[in-house]
Amino acid sequence: MLFTAHQIQTIREQALGMDKHRQVTPEVLATIYDHRLFHLFVPDELEGRMTSLPEAARIFQESARIDGNLGWLVTIGAGGGFFASLMSREVSRRVFAHREAVIAGSGMPTGTARQVDGGFIVNGSWKYCSGSTYATTFTANAVIEPGFTVQDATGELTADQNQSLIRSFILNPGQIEILEDWNAFGLRATASHTISAVNAFVPFEMTFSLTETQGYENETIYQYPFLPFAQVSFAGVAAGIAEHFLEAAESLATQRGGSSHVVGKLEERKAALEQSVSDFYESVEGSWEELLRNGELSNATEAEITARSITAAQTALSCGQQVFPLLGLSAAMEDAEINRCWRDLQTACSHALLRSF
């Protein structure tokens, strides 16, 4: 187990306050920093703690089992380390090589970039940027305005006349305005706000392409396809929140002298979740072994990872959907632990990558 009993107790004691005030506490952030959880996919030489995907998914699950906000923030923050291989080594060191380094941002290309001498002028807004209030760096995707050129990883200019080119831009907090609009009913403390940039100048070296590796090519995690990587990460969170939900439901049912129907449904959902999570990790570990062996994943393996991730998340979601209505009015109170778990579970499983449609 990664977290100590004292850390788990502290986080859970602060969970209600985080939910009410919609922000993570300094103590919880300090725990994340102490364990270097935002650096699970950052090379060791950049003060990272490079971790295999199967191990990281279990860390995400363990974090989310303690508290949904913790699990989500750890997962999103760690995921930003994936970009270390897409930046130059000098820029990667600048971005990642300190204790509190963490990226927030968005993959949606809802900004524009106009080329100027030495770089780009970036404008736009990007939704759902988890961790926005404590991020040390922001990344955002923007469409290069037609008729301009961009530099590739070799420094050569590449024409962009006939198609929209999307590029990723590295911005510092001083270039970003945070619009505090994350009013979701779950994962309230994740600060998943909209960010905006107005006429922000970004030098060429502070941009990157999601398809061009610039360093750390030998790190296995950077060879893992990004879509299944993200799905595995989010599925781990969903599983952890569902486990916490079932724990809280069992405790509540025991206090209320739950009927055999409620107890039976709890046991049924626990068994279904355990089987689904077991199948999920079997596939994740198999894919990691395949990557180590072959240097790439087959299309069939990628499809299997996607399917197993979605199934695990949907099974996790079903725990809330099938058990929550059986728990009575006490579960409907927003300050109840079970209510918070239920809301977090619904919110996490609403992510587009965890849906089958």
Show the residue positions of the predicted features.
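FAD-binding subdomain of flavoenzyme oxidoreductases
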Residues: 119-199
